[in-house]
A protein has these predicted regions:
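Domain-level signature for soluble enzymes in the chorismate/prephenate branch of the shikimate pathway
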Residues: 1-285
């Protein structure tokens, strides 16, 4: 891959968890904030950025809405995954004691992850547009009774004080991100490679059951299989899958060949190494 801008695009304000993921995965690259997921993809396609950082699922709240619809049409390729722990801090105007905070603002998903802390301290929840945007608003208002729930990075960027760290209810809360590029990279090999693809089955009885049979008979582990409607039509279903292995591995090659027989379309989205945290989480489960 030839780098032209040394930028990685993400959705949200500076200080968002996607921004934190960019810093973790590509610390030498400039992070480019974008308003929407579509804008992130367009930034790479239009050469404003080299890579896109997109969240796809959270261990507490499941898959991120709309992402699986965007991936097949993006024209981009998955080259890496990044697991990022969601550490939540209570951020306020510097010098504010915790006892003075009456309300905390954040994205509705993050508010739901800190119910225990909020209840213990009598803090009311206010819904904001996003996590980093809420931190920015708290800094702008300058009201000591108003705080934000966001990543510690947001506090650094907007000059807020961290009154409490690690206030999330679930200490293993993790978001999985995909790093995407204009060009695929099938050259890398390791013991833990992943292949992601989307497919539609042919309109024949038991097509999905038969399509999945090749992975079982060839000993290929499927780590994810999700379905979603296409264009809002109940009868038009597309499937997204992650499997262990490289398409050039004989076992996976045979499984994909069998899958093709029962599908009307099959598109590989990317081949990439598994994040080390994936195995650590599996062993801890």
């Amino acid at each position: 891959m030839t780098t032209t801008t040394n930028r990685i695009a993400f959705q949200g304000e500076p200080g968002a968890y996607s921004h934190e993921a960019c810093r973790k995965a590509r610390p030498a690259m400039e992070a480019l904030p974008c308003r929407t997921f579509e804008d992130v993809i367009d930034a790479v396609r239009s050469d404003q950025a080299d890579l896109a950082m997109l969240p796809v699922e959270n261990s507490t709240y499941g898959r991120v809405a709309d992402i699986h619809h965007l991936l097949p049409e993006s024209g981009l390729h998955i080259i890496e995954e990044a697991f990022v722990r969601v550490h939540i801090s209570l951020l306020a105007i510097p010098g504010t004691p915790l006892s003075e905070v009456r309300e905390a603002m954040s994205h509705t998903v993050l508010l739901g992850q800190c119910r225990g802390f909020m209840r213990r301290h009598g803090i009311l929840a206010l819904t904001g547009a996003d996590t980093a945007g809420s931190a920015k608003e708290v800094a702008t208002r300058g009201n000591p009774s108003l705080a934000a729930l966001a990543a510690p990075l947001a506090g650094e960027i907007y000059g807020l004080e961290r009154l409490a760290d690690g206030i999330e209810d679930r200490q293993n809360n993790t978001t999985r991100f995909l790093i995407m590029s204009r060009q695929p990279d099938y050259s890398r090999r390791s013991d833990r490679m992943l292949t992601s693809f989307v497919f539609r089955v042919r309109n024949i009885p038991a097509a999905l059951y038969k399509a999945m049979g090749g992975f079982a008979t060839n000993g290929v582990n499927m780590t994810k299989l999700e379905s979603y409607m296409v264009d809002g039509v109940f009868t038009a279903t597309q499937f997204y899958a992650d499997v262990e292995g490289h398409p050039e591995d004989p076992a996976l090659q045979r499984a994909l060949d069998e899958l093709r027989y029962f599908t009307s379309s099959l598109d590989v989205l990317g081949v990439y190494p598994a994040d080390p945290l994936r195995e650590a989480q599996r062993q801890a489960a």
